[in-house]
């Protein structure tokens, strides 16, 4: 995960100080890209321990089209708690946009199912895109999407994906996002009969919060360890049939967890 540490180091050394919505302050650079070849291992950060359970359950929750934190809470995942209302609702966030984008004529568009079908039927299409950024509904969302749009690409029997992340919390958020989209590629590849290719991460406002600098320095002092592998139950052929038990992370070694506050 040298790519990730290089981004963190870039922002730590050359980031511009900016105010932000949370009042915490950030050091930021604009525009950065990282590439991860999934044949080289599963890109889960090793310079601190990452909570894979939260990553997997959050992705399954997105794919269900769910926008209430009840499922997450039932599975011991608290990463969305701070933004939910008293009923656990988050408004029309990721899952709603991915699975039920509202059209002007009253239809609801299942972007994920459409992309699965297009990958199978027309893999050379340049329209293999899913967007979570719906300007008409941004004000109804408790937190507008940070990872806003992603595109799949098929070449030589391999499925790749590029994400555009408008807002990238490098210390806390980005390791989750990298692992989540890498896992989505593995799942999509399996159900479409392709091999996993690359995950390309493109960031807009890439930032370290001002109260994460000591944690970033500690992480930068650590040497990356070999990447693990992720095994999926090969019998699952329907993207929406995956369960938590269908994933096994093999060979994950990491440095200890580093605690840091979440900016709300």
Curated annotation (Swiss-Prot):
A biological process from GO: methylation
Protein's pathway: Pyrimidine metabolism; dTTP biosynthesis
EC class name: transferase
Claim: tRNA-binding is one of the keywords in the record: no
Alphabetically ordered keywords of this record: Cytoplasm, Methyltransferase, Nucleotide biosynthesis, Transferase
Subcellular location: Cytoplasm
UniProt-listed Pfam families: Thymidylat_synt
Positions that bind (6R)-5,10-methylene-5,6,7,8-tetrahydrofolate: 51, 169, 263
Transmembrane segments: none
Quaternary structure annotation from Swiss-Prot or TrEMBL: Homodimer.
HAMAP family named in the record: Thymidy_synth_bact (MF_00008)
Function: Catalyzes the reductive methylation of 2'-deoxyuridine-5'-monophosphate (dUMP) to 2'-deoxythymidine-5'-monophosphate (dTMP) while utilizing 5,10-methylenetetrahydrofolate (mTHF) as the methyl donor and reductant in the reaction, yielding dihydrofolate (DHF) as a by-product. This enzymatic reaction provides an intracellular de novo source of dTMP, an essential precursor for DNA biosynthesis.
PANTHER family: THYMIDYLATE SYNTHASE, THYMIDYLATE SYNTHASE 1
Protein name: Thymidylate synthase
Organism classification: Bacteria, Pseudomonadati, Pseudomonadota, Gammaproteobacteria, Pseudomonadales
Encoding gene, per UniProt annotation: thyA
